[in-house]
Amino acid sequence: MANKIEVKELLEAGVHFGHMTRKWDPNMAPYIYMERNGIHIINLYKTAAKIEEANEALKKIAASGRKILFVATKKQAKDIVADKAKAANMPYITERWPGGMLTNFVTIRKAVKKMSSIDKMKKDGTFNTLSKKERLQVDRLRAKLEKNLGSIADMSRLPAALFVVDIKAEHIAIKEAQKLNIPVFAMVDTNSDPREVDYVIPANDDASKSIDKILSLVTTAVIEGLSDRGAEKEVEAAEEAPAAEAEAAPATEE
């Protein structure tokens, strides 16, 4: 059951403000509470329940050691998503979505490795043997790669899930995830089709306060999942230690 404090917090963050009624998607009807001054108002009790449902699944994914890729390229969401994803130690895309990011992941990984090889060149001195023009070209390439792919440099395999802010803006990312059966979690406003995603969080996806509130709640669940994983590993290590010591101990003669 969604608790009242959470609903009050959602209300204060303006999560309930949808789009103008003429822009609505009829599939969002179950999540709409009412119409006010030509604007659809989202039912925050349903939003709170959907956050809890999404958080439970996100926590499990994080606890299993898999990655959740956060995606938000719109201006008012970029910095918020980057900060929250970083805090949760998860990859994110806040610049233009690189076409084939998921469906052609091998090529994307090659581009990420190119960054590493440039860094290696700078460390071992190879970079200094290049001409001034070549060094400039390499630096430009490194900066471009960092801007577009730096935030996914640690993602060595496909993510277990996507978390998206604004499914209309990120429709290419969602299509790629669908092709690969990667579950999509998303903030879905009243002008969007919730059938496009697996875990719908009905919410205002335009106001920064609303985006910040939802991202704070979901990344807290992710961090809890990571914490559970860490605690589990510590317990396993503690259980294995006595057995390892017993095996290593020399046999004593009677």
Curated annotation (Swiss-Prot):
Region (Disordered): 228-254
Keywords: Ribonucleoprotein, Ribosomal protein
CDD domains per the UniProt record, alphabetical: RPS2
Pfam families per the UniProt record, alphabetical: Ribosomal_S2 (PF00318)
GO biological process: translation
SUPFAM superfamilies given in the database record: Ribosomal protein S2
Gene Ontology MF terms: structural constituent of ribosome
Compositional bias (Low complexity): 240-254
A GO CC term assigned to this protein in UniProt: cytosolic small ribosomal subunit
Family: Belongs to the universal ribosomal protein uS2 family.
PANTHER family, alphabetized: 30S RIBOSOMAL PROTEIN S2 PROKARYOTIC AND ORGANELLAR, SMALL RIBOSOMAL SUBUNIT PROTEIN US2M
HAMAP family: Ribosomal_uS2_B (MF_00291_B)
Protein name: Small ribosomal subunit protein uS2
Organism name: Flavobacterium johnsoniae (strain ATCC 17061 / DSM 2064 / JCM 8514 / BCRC 14874 / CCUG 350202 / NBRC 14942 / NCIMB 11054 / UW101) (Cytophaga johnsonae)
Upper taxonomic lineage: Bacteria, Pseudomonadati, Bacteroidota, Flavobacteriia, Flavobacteriales
